[in-house]
């Protein structure tokens, strides 16, 4: 030890110049080396930093940073102490085990298998010329699809397909870049003009999906509007929830469709405080519907913006398929066609509407529609729009054609509603529990994740019917269900086959029927003596109308090509 101290005194500037320090070190010669090094103003500082980094998650890399600090601090010395510290760091990096990443993945997956929320994907290849049929892995293994969101079967519409083929042949497979770099084209402009016209807004902006649209718009609002408070329905889609998280602002979650609670929350803030109410028109897993008009009343009373997701409503409601907001003033919009009625409608009152091209419109993509300033603002600031490659030209052309086609084909919406009613009435006669709602969704309550999966498997393997089980986290635990979505192509004959199959499944698995839920006090409106049923959104009079009852301007509309997404020229 004496020789080490003498050698160190020749090398270390601190020990060489400070007699007192030399004596301190000699007194500690029987202590361990870290204790001695701590006395040095150079190594002591380096070791303090190393201890701080070692306590963090970055472990080895942080220790290396501490070594770098020590090296810088003692740059004038070629000391063996520096070499010792470096060796200590290397030893730390090589001897400690790495984090068990694969173990984490395995553990999380095991949890999902244990609670029956693990997702199994079925190989379903929908056949354009045999809708609603699909084949599985083998082409002769065919099933009837009863859970697709292709609500109007427009993905197989020949007019849509022909437009896509011609566009593909002329313009190729991809857009070539973002809207800012080579990806801005006439197809985007035409599609956005169609969407703005559909919702009777000043502009629209297309995204790669409505998940991205919801996330991008909501998060941008929260990040750019100082002190914004967001009020969100508890059953809002995951895309809206993610957007609210990314908004990094204050939020309140109100009980589903509970407008009394929403008003209580809004009243907590001065009218001058910026606010956003985020909600959906049709909630896809329950079929429940928001009271858009009353929510707009609250928004105007308390100074809030309204953000309406019409993903599961566009194409299905309103005389022209613009959604529930249009349906609220059905006759006025029908008589006006693509023009605006002479009074301020519910759709006019909503500040921003988002929707999808991937459900009723049969293609893929999402969008937001709103005022000219809002659309230009989102175009200019939203990373989810700015840094995303544009949708392929053929997709945008097909989506625009689908919007045009369904706008003048009221019968598509009517057939979908009639087929939905036929299935709901038939299941009610069998005592099979359908969660009551006024929309096109047929949620059949099971209430158990394992049994819901079994029911889906029996339908597929025995009856050649595909209905996906819906489990947590898509729905709350204990409310697992089968979600059935009739289309214009699901005839009454096919519906009869479905209902016979469900009767067999319910009998085989001894699943609870309506009377069983009644005995338990009811759940989600099933067997609940206090449940007040809502009338269907579509009235009997609306279902008797024909395509000829629509305004002529919807059939050969002159739609002005908007330039909002090109940049507004003041």
From Swiss-Prot:
The keyword Transferase applies. It is found in: Mitochondrion matrix. The active site is at 359. Keywords: Acyltransferase, Heme biosynthesis, Mitochondrion, Pyridoxal phosphate, Transferase, Transit peptide. Transmembrane segments: none annotated. It catalyses: succinyl-CoA + glycine + H(+) = 5-aminolevulinate + CO2 + CoA. Pyridoxal 5'-phosphate binds at residues 284, 312, 356, 388-389. GO terms for biological process: protoporphyrinogen IX biosynthetic process. Pathway: Porphyrin-containing compound metabolism; protoporphyrin-IX biosynthesis; 5-aminolevulinate from glycine: step 1/1. Residues 1-53 form a transit peptide. One of its GO terms (cellular component) is mitochondrial matrix. Substrate binds at residues 119, 232, 251, 474. One of its GO terms (molecular function) is 5-aminolevulinate synthase activity. The modification N6-(pyridoxal phosphate)lysine is found at residue 359. Its cofactor is pyridoxal 5'-phosphate. CDD domains: KBL_like. It comes from the Eukaryota. Its EC number is 2.3.1.37. Gene3D superfamilies: Aspartate Aminotransferase, domain 1, Type I PLP-dependent aspartate aminotransferase-like (Major domain). The keyword DNA repair does not apply. Its main location: mitochondrion. Catalyzes the synthesis of 5-aminolevulinate (ALA) from succinyl-CoA and glycine, the first and rate-limiting step in heme biosynthesis. Belongs to the class-II pyridoxal-phosphate-dependent aminotransferase family. Homodimer. This is 5-aminolevulinate synthase, mitochondrial. The lineage of its organism: Eukaryota, Fungi, Dikarya, Ascomycota, Saccharomycotina.
């Amino acid at each position: 030890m004496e020789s080490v101290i003498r050698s160190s005194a020749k090398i270390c500037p601190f020990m060489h110049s400070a007699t007192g320090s030399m004596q301190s070190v000699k007194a500690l010669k029987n202590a361990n080396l870290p204790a001695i090094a701590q006395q040095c103003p150079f190594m002591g500082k380096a070791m303090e930093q190393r201890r701080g980094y070692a306590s963090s998650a970055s472990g080895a890399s942080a220790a290396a940073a501490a070594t770098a600090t020590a090296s810088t601090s003692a740059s004038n010395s070629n000391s063996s102490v520096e070499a010792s510290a470096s060796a200590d760091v290397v030893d730390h990096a090589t001897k400690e085990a790495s984090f068990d990443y694969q173990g984490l993945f395995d553990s999380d997956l095991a949890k999902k298998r244990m609670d029956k929320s693990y997702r199994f994907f079925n190989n379903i290849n929908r056949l354009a010329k045999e809708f609603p049929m699909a084949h599985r892995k083998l082409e002769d293994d065919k099933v009837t699809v009863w859970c697709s969101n292709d609500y109007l079967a427009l993905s197989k519409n020949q007019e849509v397909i022909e437009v896509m083929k011609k566009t593909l042949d002329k313009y190729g497979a991809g857009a070539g870049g973002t809207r800012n770099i080579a990806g801005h084209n006439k197809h985007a402009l035409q599609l956005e003009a169609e969407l703005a016209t559909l919702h009777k807004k000043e502009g629209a902006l297309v995204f790669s999906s409505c998940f991205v649209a919801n996330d991008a718009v909501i998060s941008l609002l929260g990040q750019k509007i100082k002190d914004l408070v967001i009020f969100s329905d508890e059953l809002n889609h995951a895309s809206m929830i993610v957007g609210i998280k990314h908004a990094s602002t204050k939020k309140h979650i109100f009980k589903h469709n509970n407008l009394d609670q929403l008003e209580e929350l809004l009243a907590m803030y001065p009218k001058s405080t910026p606010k956003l109410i985020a909600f959906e028109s049709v909630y896809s897993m329950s079929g429940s519907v928001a009271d858009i008009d009353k929510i707009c009343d609250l928004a105007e009373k308390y100074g809030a913006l309204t953000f309406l997701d019409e993903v599961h409503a566009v194409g299905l409601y309103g005389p022209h398929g613009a959604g529930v907001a249009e349906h609220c003033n059905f006759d006025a919009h029908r008589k006006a066609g693509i023009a605006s009625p002479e009074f301020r409608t519910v759709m006019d009152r909503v500040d921003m509407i988002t929707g999808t091209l991937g459900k009723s419109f049969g293609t893929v993509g999402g969008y937001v529609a709103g005022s000219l300033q809002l659309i230009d603002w989102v175009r200019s600031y939203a990373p989810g729009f700015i840094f995303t490659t544009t949708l392929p030209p053929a997709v945008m052309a097909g989506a625009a054609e689908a919007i045009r086609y369904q706008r003048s084909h009221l019968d598509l919406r009517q057939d979908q509603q009639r087929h939905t009613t036929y299935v709901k009435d038939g299941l009610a006669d069998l005592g099979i529990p359908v969660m009551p709602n006024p929309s096109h969704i047929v949620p059949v309550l099971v209430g158990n994740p394992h049994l819901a999966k079994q029911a889906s498997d029996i339908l597929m393997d025995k009856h050649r019917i595909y209905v996906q089980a819906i489990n947590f986290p898509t729905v709350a635990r204990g409310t697992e269900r089968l979600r059935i979505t009739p289309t214009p192509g699901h005839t009454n004959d096919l519906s009869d086959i479905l209902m016979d199959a469900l009767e067999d499944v319910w009998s085989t698995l001894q699943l609870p029927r309506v009377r069983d839920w009644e005995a338990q006090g009811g759940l989600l409106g099933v067997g609940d003596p206090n449940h007040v049923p809502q009338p269907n959104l579509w009235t009997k009079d609306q279902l008797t109308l024909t395509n000829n009852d629509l305004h002529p301007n919807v059939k050969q509309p002159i739609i002005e090509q908007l330039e909002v997404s090109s940049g507004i020229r003041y």
